[in-house]
Amino acid sequence: MTDLPAVRGRLTPNRDLSDLTWLRVGGPADYLFQPADLEDLQEFLRNLPADMDVFPMGVGSNLIVRDGGLRSVVIRLGRGFNGIEVDGDTVTAGAAALDAHVARKSAEAGVDLTFLRTIPGSIGGAVRMNAGCYGSYVADVFMSAQVVLRDGSLATLSAEDLQFKYRQTELAPGAVLVSATLRGPKGDPDALAARMEDQLRKRDETQPTKERSAGSTFRNPAGFSSTGKADDVMDLKAWKVIDNAGLRGATLGGAQMSEKHSNFMINAGGATAADLEGLGENVRKKVYADSGIWLEWEIMRVGDPKRS
């Protein structure tokens, strides 16, 4: 076993990751590191052998870890990284702060980040993936982010550094985003709270919120960045082309395309990562055969298949 740097947080070898993903699948990581604080994270990365891969992991809301696990040090931020501070119309949130919590606390202070309320996951993942909903994206409200680079140094990144695109950014490999500062328009707290309640109601009516899912499985075919027309208002939707191909409710093993929303893949019971990824690939092929459109995964898939 490789000698790793001493830490004040928790460092666990051969840590199964299935309980850390919303789909409850996946094999073990070589190591899981949960740093105590920023300095602990910096010191660890500074002294970690350069040939060891690092994979920053949020709350696992948009992730399939393959059944063979990850040959990496997985870094998962916790309580030391979930603070939320509001100053005027700016909000600084730790990467581990849940999107919903950021939206609520911002609204209480009269700052409109309500689009974050129904986005699963944490701010770190939301920034990394340029998450969006209701025609708004993180890129629209982003000011800056602090990241710890692979060598342990701390850097402040601008929107230009991250190069926001539709559902992606250009973040250096091994870099761990630790906080982000956002700026939203001012609004009446009661009106913002009411809007979020309406958003939650609509979400619960249309999405399988009681099932184990990872949010949208595929990107909408005509995905624009937030500098163009938002994909949320495009007519062509991933769920529509999936429906047109007759794949609502399609299954493979314990994996299923939800009957409630056909662009949501669920673990209907006992699914493996191979079931979920295999079903997704089946859907992609059949949609292409039906419509000529190759759907792109929105769920991140990482790791190795299980060895037979």
Curated annotation (Swiss-Prot):
Transmembrane segments: none annotated. Residues 24-187 form the FAD-binding PCMH-type domain. Its main location: cytoplasm. Residues 198-213 have a biased composition (Basic and acidic residues). It catalyses: UDP-N-acetyl-alpha-D-muramate + NADP(+) = UDP-N-acetyl-3-O-(1-carboxyvinyl)-alpha-D-glucosamine + NADPH + H(+). Its cofactor is FAD. SUPFAM superfamilies: FAD-binding/transporter-associated domain-like, Uridine diphospho-N-Acetylenolpyruvylglucosamine reductase, MurB, C-terminal domain. One of its GO terms (cellular component) is cytosol. InterPro entries: FAD-bd_PCMH, FAD-bd_PCMH-like_sf, FAD-bd_PCMH_sub1, FAD-bd_PCMH_sub2, MurB, MurB_C, MurB_C_sf, Oxid_FAD_bind_N. Belongs to the MurB family. This is UDP-N-acetylenolpyruvoylglucosamine reductase.
